[in-house]
Amino acid sequence: EEKKRNSFLSFFIPRKGFIATPILIDINILVFIVMIASGVGIMSPSTLSLLKWGADFGPLTLTGDWWRTVTCNFIHIGAFHLLMNMYAFMYVGLLLEELIGGRRMFVSYLLTGLCSAAFSLYMHGETISTGASGSIFGLYGIFLAFLLFHRIAKEQRKALLTSILIFVGYNLVYGMKAGIDNAAHIGGLLSGFVLGIIYVVGYKFEKPDAQRTVSIIGELGIFCIFLFSFMILCKNVPPLYPEIRKEWESGIVEAYLNGELEEENENSNHSAVNATDNLSSRKVPAYTPVGNDDTWLSYYDAATKFSCQY
């Protein structure tokens, strides 16, 4: 029993040759624990909580909150979401980190996470997106490149390739369900596959310095592609996005959630409401939440046909 416990705990403790995976898993778990400690729901956090903690959401991400493309990869929608993602991460991490090393593992998680967030913003910027799955798909994409281009021992390659393809295929098909951000999965997978090819090419050089140089050049190239794409998205935001941001910054969102707006409108004392020609005063009537799961954004969707989901 003691051996089993120690074996399980070893997945979360960095050691030589296995550093990045446990650290990244620990960060994801720690963020979730801090969220819970601050009052966020353990099984189904509210939309407002996710946005406050850094979920990816086009009207906010593309109008100043660029950091959401990073933070969204460490935030999860409940304990089950975290558990499933960390299990998948642990599986690929055990296999992949031995091949590419800790530095590349760290960079891969962050880079493919950025690319998955950007592709999600491009495909449906109104979707509230969180979770490590975009980065995890990126890591599976890297491993897939290694399998296809023969960097894995032949006797292991077929079984691993079958396993990875089943995992990726199942999750992409399952991701067609409503409420799952398949665009992030695809963006992560494609960017990971390209990054994996770059790493494979780098390993064709015998000298470690040459391998490292190829890797870094490739990583910088992918980051530049992300940066260029993100700048284009920011430059071409729909007209509604800046208005939604005003709603967010004015405190109207929390007012709706807390059932305060109707009272504030009656008293006409809320400066943020009166200061701008905001969306709520023009399009959304007075509103009181009807349940714990009822949020300003879900009501906003019903009232104005603006799609908000995660």
Q: Residue ranges of each PLM-predicted region?
A:
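Membrane-embedded catalytic cores of phosphoryl/pyrophosphoryl-handling enzymes
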Residues: 151-170, 174-182
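Alpha-helical membrane-inserting segments
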Residues: 34, 115, 119, 123, ...
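Cytoplasmic-side transmembrane-helix entry/capping segments in multi-pass membrane proteins
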Residues: 105-108, 132-136, 157-162
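N-terminal TM1-TM2 helical hairpin plus the immediately adjacent luminal interfacial "cap"
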Residues: 20-132, 180
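Alpha-helical transmembrane bundle and helix-membrane interface signal
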Residues: 98-102, 146-161, 200-213
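Membrane-water interface of alpha-helical transmembrane segments
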Residues: 11-25, 103, 157-161, 212-216
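C-terminal transmembrane module of polytopic alpha-helical membrane proteins
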Residues: 1-14, 173-296, 300-304
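Alpha-helical transmembrane segments that form the membrane-embedded catalytic/substrate-binding core
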Residues: 82-91, 130-142, 181-200
